[in-house]
C-alpha cells in the first residue's frame, strides 16, 4: 500500500470512527485507553509526565497530532502558553479540539512528517501516539520535523510505542493465549480499528530504542524515558479492583519513577525528548 493510501486510511478512521463521541466527552477511540476507576490514578499520572519536559511558560506550543485533546491532563500542557497550535490529519479531531479550547487554539490540518511551519517557531512541541500511524519511511522525518520547528535549545516531546518490547512480551503471554481462543467476525470499521490497534496497515514495521537512538543521534540529542510501561491490554486483563489493582499500579508507577530509562526502553510506551545536540548548530 502506498504512503498516501495509508494516511488516507488513518484519516478515514479518525474522521468516521475514532473521534466520534459516543457519550459526553468520551470518544469511540476510548477503546484504546483504560478508563476504569481502578486504573484512573495511574493513567492520569502517566499523562502528566509530559509536562515535566516542556517549557513551563511560552508563546506557542505545537500539539502535533493533537486529536481532540481528549484528557484533562492534555489540556494542562498549554496552560501557560499564549496559543496552542493543534495540527492533525483529521478535521473531526480539530473540530473537537476547538470545542475544548476555543480561542486559546489555532487549528491546522496537516501531516506531522511535513510540518507547514518555519524553523524554530515553537517554545515546545508535544506529540502523543501519532508517529506510529505514519508509514515507516516517515517516522524519522517526523521526529526531525518536530525538532526543526522548535526554537533552539527547546524540547520536542513525543510518546510512541515499541515493537513487542520485552516487558510487554513477558506480561502479555497469558492474555495473548486467551485471545487466540476467541473468534468472531469483524465489520469493515472494526477491521480498520484493529489494524490501527495492532500497528498493521499504518506502517510496515516498528523499532526499538537502540534503532531509534542510532537513527536520530546524528541530528539531535535523544533521551528515552518512560511514559507508561504497560499497555491497555495488560491493564484490562490483569488489573482488578478486588485483586489489589490500585496497589499494584502504585507500585508499578513508583518503579517507573525510580528507573525511568530502563522502563522507557523495555516497556510499552516511551517518552522521547529531543533537543539540539550540545555545542553544535542545527543542520
Where do the model's predicted regions map?
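Conserved class I S-adenosyl-L-methionine
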Residues: 1-54, 70-74, 155-184
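Class I SAM-dependent methyltransferase SAM/SAH-binding core
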Residues: 62, 67-114
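A conserved beta-strand element that flanks and buttresses the S-adenosyl-L-methionine
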Residues: 126
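Short catalytic micro-motifs in class I SAM-dependent methyltransferases
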Residues: 129-130
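A short glycine-rich, Lys/Arg-flanked "PGG" loop and its adjoining helix->strand segment in the class I
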Residues: 140-152
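Acceptor-substrate binding/catalytic loop of class I
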Residues: 195-210
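A C-terminal cap/extension of S-adenosyl-L-methionine-dependent methyltransferases
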Residues: 210, 214, 224-283
Amino acid at each position: 500500500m502506498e504512503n498516501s493510501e495509508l494516511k488516507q486510511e488513518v484519516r478515514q478512521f479518525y474522521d468516521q470512527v475514532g473521534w466520534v463521541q459516543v457519550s459526553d466527552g468520551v470518544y469511540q477511540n476510548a477503546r484504546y485507553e483504560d478508563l476504569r476507576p481502578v486504573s484512573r490514578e495511574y493513567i492520569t499520572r502517566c499523562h502528566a509526565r509530559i509536562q515535566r519536559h516542556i517549557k513551563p511558560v511560552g508563546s506557542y506550543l505545537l500539539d502535533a497530532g493533537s486529536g481532540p485533546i481528549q484528557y484533562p491532563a492534555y489540556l494542562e500542557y498549554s496552560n501557560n502558553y499564549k496559543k496552542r497550535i493543534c495540527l492533525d490529519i483529521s478535521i473531526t479531531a480539530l473540530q473537537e479540539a476547538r470545542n475544548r479550547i476555543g480561542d486559546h487554539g489555532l487549528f491546522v490540518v496537516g501531516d506531522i512528517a511535513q510540518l507547514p511551519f518555519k524553523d524554530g517557531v515553537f517554545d515546545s512541541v508535544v506529540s502523543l501516539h501519532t508517529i506510529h500511524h505514519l508509514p515507516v519511511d516517515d517516522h524519522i522525518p517526523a521526529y526531525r520535523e518536530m525538532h526543526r520547528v522548535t526554537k533552539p535549545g527547546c524540547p520536542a516531546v513525543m510518546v510512541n510505542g515499541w515493537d513487542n518490547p520485552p516487558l510487554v512480551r513477558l506480561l502479555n503471554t497469558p492474555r495473548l493465549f486467551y485471545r487466540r481462543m476467541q473468534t468472531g467476525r469483524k465489520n469493515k470499521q472494526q477491521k480498520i480499528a484493529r489494524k490501527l490497534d495492532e500497528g498493521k496497515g499504518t506502517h510496515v514495521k516498528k523499532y526499538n530504542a537502540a534503532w531509534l537512538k542510532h537513527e536520530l543521534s546524528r541530528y539531535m540529542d535523544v533521551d528515552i524515558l518512560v511514559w507508561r510501561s504497560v499497555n491497555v491490554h495488560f491493564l484490562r486483563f490483569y488489573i482488578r479492583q478486588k485483586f489489589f489493582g490500585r496497589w499494584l499500579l502504585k507500585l508499578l508507577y513508583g518503579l517507573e519513577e525510580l528507573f525511568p530509562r530502563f522502563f522507557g526502553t523495555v516497556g510499552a510506551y516511551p517518552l522521547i525528548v529531543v533537543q539540539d545536540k550540545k555545542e553544535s548548530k542545527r543542520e
